[in-house]
């Protein structure tokens, strides 16, 4: 009940309103998150894959948009940090469930290195970008969060990626 109310009352911050052709899927997914139903949330994302929704659309239009809305709800104090972290954790699990599907296409012999430098702990954006590049044939080196700059430079020097992304 509380989850449904939170979703129904969702009003984007001015300038961030985004209409989506996947509004129904976003609402279903966020409902699972706010009900703290991990199993159902993961199954729902699998259902979207089985329905033939493109992985790019699942990542960008459904998962990213859901997380943007969750972040906005946290920012406006409509949800607490523990709920925001739970939603992030479940979304990371959902993404991991799709990981093997990212390698179905032809490879491009290109490499992306993605990292969150310094004290940046929020790695989901970098993970999404990295997975999208994998889905389009790139190999990836994902270093994760809070990596000191010297180690980033070492990784670039050792691996010679075609593209480096910082988040």
Spans of features found by a protein language model:
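Residue-level detector of anion-binding/catalytic polar loops
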Residues: 54, 139, 162
């Amino acid at each position: 009940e509380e989850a449904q109310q939170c979703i129904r009352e969702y009003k984007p911050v001015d300038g961030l309103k985004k209409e989506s052709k996947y509004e129904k899927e976003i609402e279903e997914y966020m409902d699972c998150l706010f009900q703290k139903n991990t199993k159902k949330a993961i199954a729902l994302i699998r259902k979207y894959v089985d329905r033939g929704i493109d992985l790019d659309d699942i990542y960008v239009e459904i998962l990213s948009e859901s997380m943007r809305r969750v972040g906005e709800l946290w920012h406006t104090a409509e949800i607490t940090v523990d709920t925001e972290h739970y939603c992030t954790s479940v979304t990371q699990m959902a993404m991991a469930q799709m990981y093997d599907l990212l390698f179905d296409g032809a490879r491009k012999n290109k490499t992306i290195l993605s990292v969150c430098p310094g004290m940046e702990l929020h790695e989901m954006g970098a993970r999404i970008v990295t997975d999208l590049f994998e889905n389009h044939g790139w190999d990836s080196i994902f270093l994760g969060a809070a990596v000191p700059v010297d180690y980033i430079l070492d990784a670039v020097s050792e691996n010679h990626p075609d593209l480096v992304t910082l988040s």
